[in-house]
């Protein structure tokens, strides 16, 4: 029997693709609405939206995650469960040959044609195993930030797909929490150099010290304490964020607070495990991986005001999460790259969230809430000090009215930060400072943007007028910032033409300030 088979399909035809998959499923006849097939149905819908025209079936795949599940559980069955899987690779070019190797070679010469793969387990209840597919095509409405590039080898040819791994729980070796943890660990493995456990290993790590119900089969899922233990064992720093009291009704205030709390991690590309408890339903875990963009939000989320010298007209600060709608999730129960609405009856929503656990690295001692609060305080103190210099200097300069601002906080690798600065339209002297300044491996960045035009951020047409950098391995209460950059829009002189950088030496704490070009530049677009 040939290990490879080639199929041509009509782009956008979901029914045709579903019909192709049916013979590969252990239980034949995938029926719409059947919970066990809902993830696969939504996956088919996503593949169709990517414009798939060719499918390469690869048989007898030794999928490492299913092999681990098989060893731990399925090999113990009296009924013989196969050890190997089927894998389907998708391309947006039409196959022009019946010879699989010729098709593979042609597609390898057109690398952009590769859309990713879906692995099918040889079990009836939960057939969809390791899946990596490109995100949705509409980049201006879908910002999938927790992702990586994955290398795929097929018959000697190498392919690459950028996406977020997805897996359906098998409801035996692992439930929803294990599936979400697997997705996050697999996404972060190359970037962070940490372990990428199989679902069986995740269950073992999670139940090492605390056991509730049966460990195998683990149909009852995991509690928060078990989830955090699995993360700690995998080399991450568990950090539980409370979002809503269990039993408390979701309100506009709790949903807004949840969006504010989660957004900095999502914008940082950090996967976040969110625990949902819908009304009159069992708890469920999903993985937060990105967000959409609403150019015209119904209201703006306030970050507070900055009052300078007891002014009656404070500087208004709004939060960048105001424009974030919806969040995007991987939901092992329903499928990949799906929206998480704010509040919707009969569907998982942000209002159902009671807590969240970001996959923070071990060297991050300052969380997002602390970083944002600290940077806002540093901004207020800096503007107050600069205002006093102008007021007490006797220069006769008019103190101007400050613009309304939007702040956005995220964690960023220093190499990524420097690359973004280098490619930006920031003034050269400010660029040179950031390129040569010592920075830790990762930094908290709080962007300072003008509210005017901020809705155009995805197009790079908004105006960034400064940023504050914070060392995540420091003590914010002791003033351990790295630098504060304020453009001319933030200086109190009515005719200010230059900006200022306040630089702090990370080793001895020495602080110096110097003038730099004061032009505006665009916020980061990931």
Task: For each feature predicted by the language model, list its residue ranges.
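Active-site-adjacent bridging/hinge elements
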Residues: 144-161
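Catalytic-core signature of thiol
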Residues: 2-21, 156-158, 178, 188-249, ...
